[in-house]
């Protein structure tokens, strides 16, 4: 009988232990379910955060693309300005060649003037014996008049050529002004583009703190921005070089204008001298 009671007590104790274990298992189950729910909520929040990060990356990728397009436009404008400068250089070369040819004509005119003066001297000496050589001297004077007229015509033609060169220089000045305006516009666009690139750089840096998973993409974008910044500096350098070239061309044009003015004065003096010589021979 005592053994049965003892057995009953042991069974009762086992039952209580089993109930305690069941309650503990139920509590563990509930804790596991709560932990699972928490992890699911954290996963959903993380997915939303990553989705927002991806959207921002897409947005900044578009901004970077716009910056690249603007940089390409700035480089194209700088290239156009350099092409305009090269065209002006060619025009200056043509003007200088025309000036050289005009100087050659001037030398020819001076030579003919010297010949005409010598002929006039010979005519003056011939007038001393005009009674014996009247017909011969008249023919010689007529020939000298023809030579003087030809020399005057050459001088007038050279003067006309110089006026044409002056008109060309006026046209070149207009072209230079337009090239300078283009260079200034290119410099302004480069400055605007640099500000936009700075904004993109700041935005990309702030994106680094949002998700480590996208750090490699951000590094790539920063490298692209560095390349774009280098290209922008190169475009600015080209624009500055174009401005310096325009200034040099303007100086060359000023020098050519001064030389042109001096040559005109020289031609005017020669023309007046020819007129005086012609008048002197006519009066003789």
Curated annotation (Swiss-Prot):
Residues 1-284 form a coiled coil. Residues 12-40 have a biased composition (Basic and acidic residues). InterPro entries: Tropomyosin. Disulfide bonds: none annotated. The keyword Coiled coil applies. Residues 1-40 are annotated as: Disordered. It holds the Pfam family Tropomyosin. Its main location: cytoplasm. Keywords: Actin-binding, Coiled coil, Cytoplasm, Cytoskeleton, Muscle protein. The keyword Coiled coil applies. GO terms for cellular component: actin cytoskeleton; cytoplasm. It is found in: Cytoplasm, Cytoskeleton. It comes from the Eukaryota. GO terms for molecular function: actin filament binding; identical protein binding; protein heterodimerization activity; protein homodimerization activity. The molecule is in a coiled coil structure that is formed by 2 polypeptide chains. The sequence exhibits a prominent seven-residues periodicity. Binds to actin filaments in muscle and non-muscle cells. Plays a central role, in association with the troponin complex, in the calcium dependent regulation of vertebrate striated muscle contraction. Smooth muscle contraction is regulated by interaction with caldesmon. In non-muscle cells is implicated in stabilizing cytoskeleton actin filaments. Belongs to the tropomyosin family. Homodimer. Heterodimer of an alpha (TPM1, TPM3 or TPM4) and a beta (TPM2) chain. This is Tropomyosin alpha-1 chain. It comes from Rana temporaria.
């Amino acid at each position: 009988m005592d053994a049965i009671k003892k057995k009953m007590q042991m069974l009762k104790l086992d039952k209580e232990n089993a109930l305690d274990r069941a309650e503990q298992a139920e509590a563990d189950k509930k804790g596991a379910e709560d932990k699972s729910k928490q992890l699911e909520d954290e996963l959903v929040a993380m997915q939303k955060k990553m989705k927002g990060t991806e959207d921002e990356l897409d947005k900044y990728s578009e901004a970077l693309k716009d910056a690249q397009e603007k940089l390409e436009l700035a480089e194209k404008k700088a290239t156009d300005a350099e092409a305009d400068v090269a065209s002006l250089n060619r025009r200056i070369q043509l003007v200088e060649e025309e000036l050289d040819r005009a100087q050659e004509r001037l030398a020819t005119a001076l030579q003919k003037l010297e010949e005409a003066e010598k002929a006039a001297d010979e005519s003056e000496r011939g007038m001393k014996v005009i009674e014996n050589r009247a017909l011969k001297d008249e023919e010689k004077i007529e020939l000298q008049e023809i030579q003087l007229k030809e020399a005057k015509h050459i001088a007038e033609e050279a003067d006309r050529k110089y006026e044409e060169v002056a008109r060309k220089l006026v046209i070149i000045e207009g072209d230079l002004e337009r090239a300078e305006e283009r260079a200034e516009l290119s410099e302004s666009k480069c400055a605007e583009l640099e500000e936009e690139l700075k904004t993109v750089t700041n935005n990309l840096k702030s994106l680094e703190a949002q998700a480590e998973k996208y750090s490699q993409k951000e590094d790539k974008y920063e490298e692209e921005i560095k390349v774009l910044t280098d290209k922008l500096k190169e475009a600015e350098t080209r624009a500055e070089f174009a401005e310096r070239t325009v200034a040099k061309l303007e100086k060359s044009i000023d020098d050519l204008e001064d030389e042109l003015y001096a040559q005109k004065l020289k031609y005017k003096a020669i023309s007046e001298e020819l007129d005086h010589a012609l008048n002197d021979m006519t009066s003789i």
